[in-house]
Regions:
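ATP-binding/phosphotransfer module of carbohydrate and carboxylate kinases, centering on a glycine-rich
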Residues: 1-65, 69-111, 115, 119-143, ...
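Short, acidic Gly/Pro/Ser/Thr-rich loop/turn segments
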Residues: 95-97, 155-157, 223
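Glycine-rich phosphate-binding loop and adjoining helix at the ATP-binding site
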Residues: 108-212, 338-350
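Short, acidic, Ser/Thr-enriched surface-loop or helix-capping motifs
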Residues: 103, 158, 227
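Short glycine-rich anion-binding loops that position phosphate/pyrophosphate groups of nucleotides
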Residues: 153-156, 219-221, 333-334
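Glycine/GP-enriched mid-protein hinge/lid loop-to-helix segment characteristic of carbohydrate kinases
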Residues: 111-113, 119-123, 172, 179-194, ...
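Short glycine-aspartate micro-motif
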Residues: 77, 87-91, 145-149, 213-217, ...
């Protein structure tokens, strides 16, 4: 076994071969010559390193397109072996909380709705029950599960596996990774939900080919995550990306974090629906409010536009701070593509330097109910597949 932080984990990948794994994650199948060129290795060095990975079963060889220089012989392609092992993901602050079983390609193979639990040990027991169900459904042995990733809303000390504070769960200074490991006997890694989403998008999602990108997680809370030069940016204490707590109205409404005027108090689904109710508009979802606005209801239009503009200004400031090539806005509760997102896009364009507009790709994605759990599984996948020091 290999030491990870303060915990023991399963066999990881040697740092000398990390670049091979990263290239295959980014590009899928590659020939040896293309792979060697992309990571700056000689063909002979690449052959030696890849042989070890093939013997371990981590990568596979397959026939590719025909190579005219070799008299019609098909080239041999290398790719990650999707079935080498599996990862568990648990999204604790999803509604409802979900678990998934994923493979080395990030595919969701089985899903499980976790039973409700609030106390950390009860959560660990619920995860253990979920693992039993997931491997039963997929008919795999427990020994092939390589790790558990846990994502939650709040401030997380990833290196120590501690939930420092989560208002959503009512936790403070909970060693949740260690608690889950004791119950499941599996290496467990915990992270902030937005950081988990960023990791998942880099490994298996829309940002695989991006070295510098940002994600904005839009739902009952707003979170952010940034990849800079191909690595997740955590900041000095691990709190980088807390855009939901950018001050947008100095002296404004008090947030659950203790500050006043945070973005979370104006642009989350919770805040928007509360303000809609105060205006006499009784709706249960932002999608319903968008539908009312589409029929010409001026109060709904103004509310959505104002909230969207606030988000847009914050995203614009973030773009100017980090200069990403890509910004992914991930809609986890069904905002849709209406007045809110249109206003967000306009505010971004109106508040960033002109030369950055054409240089920054902006994408909006709506996601499935198990999205956070899938993102959580990528925490464990990253820990196994990528050099430990990259965290």
């Amino acid at each position: 076994t290999e030491e990870i932080g303060h915990r023991q984990a399963g066999p990881g990948i040697s740092s000398s071969r990390t670049s091979i794994i990263e290239a295959l994650l980014e590009n899928g199948s590659m020939s040896r010559s293309d792979l060697a060129n992309s990571i700056g290795l000689s063909r002979s060095a690449l052959t030696v390193l890849s042989r070890g990975l093939i013997e371990q079963g981590l990568i596979l060889e397959s026939s590719g397109s025909y190579d005219n220089q070799q008299t019609g012989r098909p080239s041999i392609l290398l790719s990650l072996n999707a079935e080498h092992g599996y990862f568990i993901g648990a999204g604790l602050t999803e509604d409802p909380p979900m678990m998934v079983l994923t493979d080395f390609h990030g595919n969701s193979l089985a899903q499980h709705r976790m039973r409700d639990a609030e106390q950390p040990r009860a959560v660990a027991s619920a995860i253990e029950a979920g693992i039993t169900e997931l491997i039963r459904v997929r008919k795999i042995s427990r020994q092939r599960v390589l790790g558990i990733g846990v994502a939650l809303s709040g401030y997380v000390d990833h290196a120590r596996g501690i939930c420092v504070q989560s208002n959503a769960l009512g936790w403070r200074d909970v060693s949740i990774a260690e608690i889950i490991e004791r119950v499941t006997k599996l290496p467990t890694y915990v992270d902030n939900d937005a950081h988990a989403v960023a990791t998942g998008q880099k490994l298996f999602g829309h940002a695989r080919e991006s070295k510098n990108f940002s994600i904005v997680m839009l739902g009952k809370k707003i979170g952010g995550g940034h990849y800079i030069h191909g690595r997740l940016h955590r900041g000095h204490t691990g709190a980088a990306g807390e855009i939901g707590h950018y001050t947008v109205v100095p002296g404004g409404a008090r947030c659950g974090c203790g500050k006043q005027g945070c973005l979370d108090m104006f642009a989350t689904s919770t805040a928007i629906l509360e303000k809609a109710a105060e205006s006499g508009l009784k709706t249960e979802t932002v999608a319903q409010l968008e539908s009312i606005a589409a029929k010409g209801e001026s109060r709904a239009i103004e509310l959505l536009r104002h909230a969207g503009a606030m988000l847009g200004v914050v995203v614009a400031n973030s773009i100017q701070m980090n200069n990403p090539e890509l910004v992914l806005i991930v809609d986890v509760v069904g905002f849709g593509n209406g007045f809110f997102t249109t206003s967000t896009r306009q505010a971004i364009e109106n508040n960033i330097l002109p030369h950055l507009i054409a240089k920054t790709r902006l994408e909006l994605h709506s996601v499935d109910k198990d999205f956070l759990a899938r993102s959580a599984s990528s925490i464990a996948a990253h820990q196994f597949l990528i050099d430990q020091t990259s965290y």
